[in-house]
Amino acid sequence: MTEQTLVLIKPDGVSRGLVGEVLARIERKGLKIAALELKQVSDELAREHYAEHADKPFFGSLIEFITSGPVVAAVLEGPRAIAAFRQLAGGTDPVEKAAPGSIRGDFGLETQYNLVHGSDSPESAKREIGLWFPEFPVA
């Protein structure tokens, strides 16, 4: 079954020149890039995207980080796209939990500055794609 997922290359990935590397890994995995856009994230979009973390102590720094520079947003499609990208990304903590060979394992150093975001469920993917690509047809 074909699935959709939202992927963000966060400001640290963009500023470090890793966009091409991340997109190449996505394509080598066999996922289709159905939509792609470089954008400066508004405070409003950041707060909507990370709404589930609003009551957590790191929320303010998370919003500050994601709005600190351009982000590459993409919609990926493919069989088990959500799990496939999350495997490619590696664990959230790039030093302790991300396997070597994953994006975070190879390039990440800190939990907050972990280069990429990928939707964690079909429900999250639908919500996130609707936020980042309001005109895009969500499956």
Curated annotation (Swiss-Prot):
The active site is at H117 (pros-phosphohistidine intermediate). It catalyses: a 2'-deoxyribonucleoside 5'-diphosphate + ATP = a 2'-deoxyribonucleoside 5'-triphosphate + ADP; a ribonucleoside 5'-diphosphate + ATP = a ribonucleoside 5'-triphosphate + ADP. Its main location: cytoplasm. GO terms for molecular function: ATP binding; metal ion binding; nucleoside diphosphate kinase activity. One of its GO terms (biological process) is CTP biosynthetic process. It is found in: Cytoplasm. It is an enzyme of class 2 (transferase). SUPFAM superfamilies: Nucleoside diphosphate kinase, NDK. Its EC number is 2.7.4.6. CDD domains: NDPk_I (cd04413). Gene3D superfamilies: Nucleoside diphosphate kinase-like domain. ATP binds at K10, F58, R86, T92, R104, N114. The keyword RNA-binding does not apply. One of its GO terms (cellular component) is cytoplasm. The keyword ATP-binding applies. Keywords: ATP-binding, Cytoplasm, Kinase, Magnesium, Metal-binding, Nucleotide metabolism, Nucleotide-binding, Phosphoprotein, Transferase. Its cofactor is Mg(2+). Belongs to the NDK family. Major role in the synthesis of nucleoside triphosphates other than ATP. The ATP gamma phosphate is transferred to the NDP beta phosphate via a ping-pong mechanism, using a phosphorylated active-site intermediate. Homotetramer. This is Nucleoside diphosphate kinase. It comes from Nocardia farcinica (strain IFM 10152). The gene is ndk.
